[in-house]
Structure formats: structure tokens, C-alpha cells
Amino acid sequence: MDILKEEFEIIKQRIKDKPEGSYVAYLTTADKKTPINKICEKVGEEATETILAAKDQDKQELIYESADLIFHILVLLANNGIEYEELMEEFERRRK
């Protein structure tokens, strides 16, 4: 199993179980009315930070911020009931 798939499975489990102290649980419950808002806010924030790191040509910061962005996108996908395999299928479809 690849590391992104493993991370995705952990995220799904934390969304389901909502363990105390879990950052994923916090993201998915921070805004009781519309939980997606906090997740979308974080995706936007991390996207901006990734862009700034790229513009600054700071390789280490770009790697760090890209990992943050990918993590938050995985949370967004999992919270919306999208499976990792569905994302991979879309990548496969685009290769043709």
C-alpha cells in the first residue's frame, strides 16, 4: 500500500471515530453547522502557502507546504465520501 493511500485510510477512520485530540476530527467538527467550511478554509490556506513557497523558490518550504495541501485535500475528499480509488481512476482516465 502506498503512503498516500495509508494516510487516506487513517483520515477516513478518524472522520468516522472522531478520537479526542485528532486534528482530522477537529477539522470535521469545528464548524457544527457546516463542517465543510473549516476544511475548505484549510485547503485554501495551504494552497496559498504552497504558491508562496513556489514563488519564493524555497524547495524545502515547497515540499512542506505541498504535503500540507495534499493532506487537507485528502481530508476534503474523505469527508465528501470520495474513495482514494475514485481519485486514482480519474488520474488513469486522464492518461488516455
Curated annotation (Swiss-Prot):
Keywords: Amino-acid biosynthesis, ATP-binding, Cytoplasm, Histidine biosynthesis, Hydrolase, Nucleotide-binding
UniProt main location, coarse: cytoplasm
Cellular localisation: Cytoplasm
Biological pathway: Amino-acid biosynthesis; L-histidine biosynthesis; L-histidine from 5-phospho-alpha-D-ribose 1-diphosphate: step 2/9
Assigned EC number: 3.6.1.31
Molecular functions per Gene Ontology: ATP binding; phosphoribosyl-ATP diphosphatase activity
SUPFAM superfamilies associated with the record: all-alpha NTP pyrophosphatases
Catalytic function, reaction form: 1-(5-phospho-beta-D-ribosyl)-ATP + H2O = 1-(5-phospho-beta-D-ribosyl)-5'-AMP + diphosphate + H(+)
GO CC terms in record: cytoplasm
GO biological process: L-histidine biosynthetic process
Top-level lineage group: Archaea
Signal peptide boundaries: none
Family the entry assigns: Belongs to the PRA-PH family.
Protein name: Phosphoribosyl-ATP pyrophosphatase
Organism: Methanococcus aeolicus (strain ATCC BAA-1280 / DSM 17508 / OCM 812 / Nankai-3)
